[in-house]
């Protein structure tokens, strides 16, 4: 297995632009293409997954709504949220299927939050990561030609109010939370969190990291 993982820090980006770049990367990659993680924040946007239903958008606003090709229902992205896109060739990994990749992503977040003294957990019937019943991390993937794209969105220090305009991930009344609810502002640091996410994901899947 090629165990190299390229990590790209992309900063603040338009959702649709990055989405189409993920599609292009996945469509043109071959057996020699190294796996990559893209770390990004997005301008405010609601995204509907393939299972998304219009009724889960409760209130229209100036925030755009984009129909995406990832799994899952509607969610919200905005600055202050760490989005980690996972572009990997699942076929390279022995005994790794889509469900196990989802589990690895959830455990990446659980282990990251544990470093801040936060006890979090996944739910078997609702992908993502939760703290005291509130959702702190959303997750949705797309698999094409045995390769993944899309990934996870971990709330760090953002305006959570627009989540009230939707049923997050299709669940009415689901409350959202973020890292800044549990630690001081200095600890809710973008670079610190992203470094921990990368480390734990790489450790779980046996990668060597190259940061670009």
Swiss-Prot record:
Tagged with keyword Zinc: no
Superkingdom, natural source: Bacteria
Site (Lowers pKa of active site Cys): 135
Reactions performed catalytically: octanoyl-[ACP] + L-lysyl-[protein] = N(6)-octanoyl-L-lysyl-[protein] + holo-[ACP] + H(+)
Active site, per annotation: 169 (acyl-thioester intermediate)
Coiled coil: none
EC category: transferase
InterPro entries: aa-tRNA-synth_II/BPL/LPL, BPL_LPL_catalytic, Octanoyltransferase, Octanoyltransferase_CS
Binding positions (substrate): 70-77, 138-140, 151-153
Keywords tagged on the record: Acyltransferase, Cytoplasm, Transferase
EC number(s) on file: 2.3.1.181
Keyword Transferase carried by entry: yes
Subcellular location: Cytoplasm
Reported function: Catalyzes the transfer of endogenously produced octanoic acid from octanoyl-acyl-carrier-protein onto the lipoyl domains of lipoate-dependent enzymes. Lipoyl-ACP can also act as a substrate although octanoyl-ACP is likely to be the physiological substrate.
Family: Belongs to the LipB family.
Name the UniProt record assigns to this protein: Octanoyltransferase
Origin species: Haemophilus influenzae (strain PittGG)
